[in-house]
Amino acid sequence: GAGKTTLLNAIAATIDPSERIITVEDAAELQFPHAHVVRLEARPASAEGVGELTIRALIRNALRMRPDRLVVGEVRGDEALDLVQALNTGHRGCLSTVHANGPVDVLRRLETLALLGGAGLPLDAIRTQIAAALDVIVHVERGLDGKRRVSQIAEVVGPCEVKALMAVPC
């Protein structure tokens, strides 16, 4: 891949060791050196159709565990709505990854995924919530030479609007 999880692990390593971190993942990939990490992992239903633990359910439960930081390994479905709502209820300094072609596309992708959440929220409300929830987007990609690098860092300044803080051609 482009190195999203590797970068997420590197950024998380800079978090104060005294902070309580709750990680939510589909498959355990995050490796944090902190003492206060609670790892939650999704699982499919059994052959009998019971026991499923979704990312959405895990995000909701993580908030009850009083995290200083919530880290969602990858947002790829309707859990985007739960993550955005969590970020807008005082859970700041959270981290996650999402597949997108650039910072503006991150906002659009989160909109689409949040709409899948089925809360019946109008698009304008979702856009406003996303803009309020996100501070900075770091975009990584694999260059033409095959090397992974941070290609853009952007500040979210409004719904569907980012301000480039750094851009490097790949």
For each feature predicted by the language model, list its residue ranges.
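Walker A (P-loop) phosphate-binding loop of P-loop NTPases
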Residues: 1
